[in-house]
Amino acid sequence: MPMRKRHFYRLLPLASLLLAACTIPVSKGPATSPTSPQWRQHEQQLQQLGQFETRGAFAYLSDKQKVYARFFWQQTSPERYRLLLTNPLGSTELELVVQPGVTQLTDNQGKRYVSDDPQEMIQKLTGMSIPLESLRQWILGLPGDTPNFTLDDKYRLKKLTYQQNGVTWVVDYQEYNTQVTPPLPSRLELNQDGQRIKLKMDSWTIK
């Protein structure tokens, strides 16, 4: 009996530790719901950016073609922007100027084309499917018209899924530039049925 009693009391501290370990609450981390006030505040800050410029690296990858270029995006108002793609030598491959109701595209031969649908015009002339209307929002870290998105632990856009006319785009936000206020994306990737668009923003200028 004495031996059993000593053995019993010797196990008590270990049993107490195990029990305590089982009752320690597990931290679930901060809530990052799209309805959280932190996200709403960040979203409002982004929506107020009416004029900005960003430049960096562009890649369009599909089974039919691969395009690598430098890009420059200049937004002068919510409905006016300019997209410039240049080759490694600095020569212009494509310049797109969008204004309300009219879009002008200039190719690498200097030929100009005019349309009222920038996305359709780029696809017909270059073969690249680029969701420009949505990209204006996505490049800032805004979800645009889709309610299907998730946030990271800093209440910034992490991933979104956008569906329109039977086409589904998935956008992954891979890195943010925290040297600007509010923080803006520095790397993101768009995927749609075998097509990939990669954007790396080297710099942001907010006006």
UniProtKB/Swiss-Prot annotation:
Which SUPFAM superfamilies did the record assign?
Answer: Prokaryotic lipoproteins and lipoprotein localization factors
Q: Provide the protein's localization.
A: Cell outer membrane
Q: Which GO terms describe its biological process?
A: lipoprotein localization to outer membrane; protein transport
Lipidated sites in chain (S-diacylglycerol cysteine)? 22
Covalently lipidated residues, kind N-palmitoyl cysteine: 22
Keyword list (alphabetical) reads: Cell outer membrane, Chaperone, Lipoprotein, Membrane, Palmitate, Protein transport, Signal, Transport
Matches recorded under Pfam families? LolB (PF03550)
Signal sequence range: 1-21
CDD domains listed in its UniProt record:
LolB
Q: Does the keyword Transmembrane helix apply?
A: no
How does the record classify its membrane topology? Lipid-anchor
Going by the entry's taxonomy, the superkingdom of the source organism is recorded as Bacteria
Name a GO CC annotation attached to this entry. cell outer membrane
By its UniProt entry, which InterPro entries does this protein fall under? LolA/LolB/LppX, OM_lipoprot_LolB
Q: How does it assemble?
A: Monomer.
* Membership in a protein family: Belongs to the LolB family.
- What is this protein's function? Plays a critical role in the incorporation of lipoproteins in the outer membrane after they are released by the LolA protein.
Q: Which NCBIfam families match?
A: lolB
Q: What name is this protein filed under?
A: Outer-membrane lipoprotein LolB
